[in-house]
Amino acid sequence: MTVHVQPCAAPAEDPVSRAVRTESGQREVFCGLTGIVWLHRKIQDAFFLVVGSRTCAHLIQSAAGVMIFAEPRFGTAIMEEKDLAGLTDANDELDRIVTQLLTRRPDIKLLFLVGSCPSEVIKLDLSRAALRLSQRFSPGVRILNYSGSGIETTFTQGEDSCLASLVPALPAAQDETSSLLVIGSLADVVEDQFMRMFDALGIGPVQFFPPRKSTALPSVGPNTKILMAQPFLPDTVRALQERGAKRLAAPFPLGVEGTTGWLRAAADAFGIDAATFDRVTEPNRVRAERALGAYKAELGGRRIFFFPDSQLEIPLARFLARELSMQLVEVGTPYLHREHLAEELKLLPAGVALTEGQDVDLQLDRCRLARPDIAVCGLGLANPLEAEGITTKWSIELVFTPIQGYEQAADLAELFARPLVRRAKLVA
């Protein structure tokens, strides 16, 4: 059975030859510290200690929505003015805080020291601190570091930096059996759904990175095949490839078409025949297509504008254009990795306006001129646009919410339909 998608108005273009506008100017994005919000829930025995300012602490606390007395698996070592002025030894204070933390929380098996804008400005070497503390607390606790700074980055790069720092700690694969490594944080329910699908297809062994426990790190080697579940992990992929792993070219598992292409890439790599693939995936495809049908009437023909924010913009645009018949006014993304997104770019309608980077004032001008039905943007732009009568969808919600796979295809469509329904009720 084939996937039913709305045909494009024009054939897709070669991803290499697509015209992309590159912009550089004032940006409107969160920093990489935001990734801690979903990573601390995913790796259940890890702790994320941000070395930063009170602003860093407020950002994570507000975004996570977790009360401090609940003892979440993240915290901030707050740098005071005397630290920034170099009047105290920040390393001594950091050692004291880490010792206090690990004494109080013996359940921590993996500690990330997370750099921020303030710690990078004063050149605090967290890599040396992590090495020093690892020697002290090994083997009970592994201590690593990465940067969550917002200097020239966007918020999803925090996960990439985190996972890349963990790659050297992955054990080497001991046998020559091919294995599949799915990389990128997924909600546990989505991970379980994919695992059942891989089992039914006869694909295995399958491992997920990041794992739910740091004591169950996946192995990697020359026979490891990488399947990207998130498009914002170039450093992690590069680090895994340096360990010998090979990346599978695939679209991302958003919507029916994306999920089918994603699973097919794995099936082809493991020699699964087409008949088996169709038999296993058909019930899920049919159910997902039926569920999407309820949203086509609401979203079909609606015009959408993507501001660059999460790096999910291109897969989302493909899903909305091909499966829900939405019209793409402009698709902006902070960074465009042409190799990793090649399968997605092939599926975008010809002639769609693509933008890499951000000059927020120019993009706001184009959005106001176009007057789309809905704009996907960061929180900082949402309220001003809503005040101007432009319906918005927060891009960060698309990272926090389980949207991958067949079972979540309709949920993903609803995320875009809901703001339009709300706007219609408000003006009625």
Swiss-Prot record:
Q: Where does [4Fe-4S] cluster bind?
A: C31, C56, C117
The record's keywords, sorted A to Z, are: 4Fe-4S, ATP-binding, Bacteriochlorophyll biosynthesis, Chlorophyll biosynthesis, Iron, Iron-sulfur, Metal-binding, Nucleotide-binding, Oxidoreductase, Photosynthesis
Question: Into which EC class is this enzyme placed?
Answer: oxidoreductase
| Protein's pathway | Porphyrin-containing compound metabolism; bacteriochlorophyll biosynthesis (light-independent)
Biological process (GO) annotations held by this record are:
light-independent bacteriochlorophyll biosynthetic process; photosynthesis, dark reaction
Q: Does the record's keyword annotation contain Cytoplasm?
A: no
Q: Does the keyword 4Fe-4S apply?
A: yes
As to how many cofactors bind and how, the note says: Binds 1 [4Fe-4S] cluster per heterodimer. The cluster is bound at the heterodimer interface by residues from both subunits.
Instruction: Give the required cofactors.
Output: [4Fe-4S] cluster
Reactions catalysed: chlorophyllide a + oxidized 2[4Fe-4S]-[ferredoxin] + 2 ADP + 2 phosphate = protochlorophyllide a + reduced 2[4Fe-4S]-[ferredoxin] + 2 ATP + 2 H2O
Q: Name one GO molecular function term.
A: oxidoreductase activity, acting on iron-sulfur proteins as donors
UniProt-listed Enzyme Commission number(s): 1.3.7.7
Subunit details: Protochlorophyllide reductase is composed of three subunits; BchL, BchN and BchB. Forms a heterotetramer of two BchB and two BchN subunits.
State the NCBIfam families in the record: DPOR_bchN, PRK02842.1
* Free-text function comment from the UniProt entry: Component of the dark-operative protochlorophyllide reductase (DPOR) that uses Mg-ATP and reduced ferredoxin to reduce ring D of protochlorophyllide (Pchlide) to form chlorophyllide a (Chlide). This reaction is light-independent. The NB-protein (BchN-BchB) is the catalytic component of the complex.
Assigned protein family: Belongs to the BchN/ChlN family.
Name of the protein in its database record: Light-independent protochlorophyllide reductase subunit N
